[in-house]
């Protein structure tokens, strides 16, 4: 070989430059004794309240999300532990006692949800007050979802199943907003309505229905296993709640999601499969014994 040159210099193989993937911190896992056995449960935040809903079918552990729905979580916890006054439906008197103890899951729909917290056990009744929703339409992306797709079909999130649904959920609120009150006034503005329908987003149509959003919050979609407030329309929360048995996209933006089941999922499944009558009421009562913070 020539002086000064190494014969057949072997270059090290080129090292590909790998950008390390961002490390997602592992979610905290805790050991909890539920239904007589130890369960390892993963939670979002070690500081979030954990509550046990103890029922005649067994116990469920829920993690609540105060950063996402502060007033809703506070209402639920204080009603549950008896530190919040409510109106007793039987006497009309203001009382303080653990609100949920002894109430039933009055509505169970297999593959959808279980609902409880009605003080009469009939699905009606409130704690004697109502409070506002805590939902961010922007964090849920409702302002980016159009009401109609390019084919003119309604967005599945609207839960429109018929022409009648479309009338009630989309057209009526839109006509009201535009001050269209007769067939004549509609005919005069049909092009305007058509144009609006093409650009209208889900947040806007829900606002026309009376929903009000707090876009400083960070909300979650109602996926399987969340606990959310039941209501009778915008800002009509009281004591009733439901726990989902499946993803329920069509409830997005209409119900405050304030927690998620973390343990005792088998108990939720058992309650969800309870035989019911035609009104979706369990044939045998599933009763809430207590709702209390997990001792840890």
Regions found by a protein language model. Name each.
Residues 2-296:
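Cross-family detector of peptidyl-prolyl cis-trans isomerase
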């Amino acid at each position: 070989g020539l002086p000064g040159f190494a014969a057949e210099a072997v270059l090290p193989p080129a090292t590909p430059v790998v950008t390390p993937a961002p490390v997602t911190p592992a979610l905290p896992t805790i050991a909890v004794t539920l239904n007589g056995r130890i369960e390892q449960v993963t939670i979002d935040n070690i500081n979030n309240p954990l509550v046990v809903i103890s029922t005649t079918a067994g116990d469920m552990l829920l993690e609540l999300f105060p950063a996402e729905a502060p007033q809703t979580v506070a209402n639920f916890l204080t009603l549950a532990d008896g530190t919040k006054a409510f109106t007793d439906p039987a006497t009309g008197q203001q009382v303080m006692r653990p609100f949920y103890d002894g109430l039933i899951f009055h509505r169970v729909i297999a593959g959808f949800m279980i609902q409880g917290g009605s003080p009469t056990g009939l699905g009606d009744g409130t704690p004697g007050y109502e409070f506002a929703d805590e939902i961010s339409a922007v964090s849920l992306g409702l302002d980016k979802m159009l009401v109609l797709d390019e084919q003119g079909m309604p967005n599945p999130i609207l839960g429109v199943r018929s022409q009648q649904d479309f009338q009630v959920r989309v057209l009526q609120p839109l006509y009201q907003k535009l001050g269209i009150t007769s067939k004549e006034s509609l005919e005069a503005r049909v092009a305007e309505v058509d144009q609006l329908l093409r650009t209208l987003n889900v947040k806007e149509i829900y606002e026309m229905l009376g929903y009000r959003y707090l876009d400083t919050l960070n909300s979650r979609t109602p996926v399987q296993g969340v606990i959310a407030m039941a209501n009778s329309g915008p800002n009509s929360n009281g004591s009733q709640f439901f726990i989902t048995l499946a993803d329920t996209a069509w409830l997005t933006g209409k119900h405050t999601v304030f927690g998620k089941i973390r343990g005792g999922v088998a108990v939720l499944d058992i309650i969800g499969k309870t035989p019911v009558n035609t009104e979706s009421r369990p044939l045998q009562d599933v009763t809430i014994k207590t709702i209390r913070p997990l001792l840890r």
